[in-house]
Amino acid sequence: MKKLQYKDGKIFENERMTYKLEGKYNVLRPSGKLVARFKIKNLFSLRGKKQAVIGNLKIEKMKDEPISQAKIINRQVRLIENGENLSLIKEDEFLANFNFGENTLEIYEDEGLAVAIFFALKKLGEK
């Protein structure tokens, strides 16, 4: 398990930067290597609904709802709220735990996907 901390658009592990958000939607390693790219869309058919797209994964959230109410539209990946945390689960395998109150991530598997989803959720949570 890795414990990571989010600060100012960057993710740190033990005070060392491990990921950063470049521009609005590119998740990079400090070396500049692209980890993931996502897009944020406003869904016009439903006012106030935003969608983040990472490959074939779609995350939807209403503007006035908290991040914990976000839903992943994919058969294999799910977000489950447990107390203050959001758990990321893929095919019954626990991938990560996000705490948006403390801006922390606990990553167990598939680090690149978990970090990209965390950044997308942070962007969806912005007003």
Task: Kindly give the residue locations of the regions a language model identified.
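Intrinsically disordered, low-complexity proline/glycine-rich segments
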Residues: 1-127
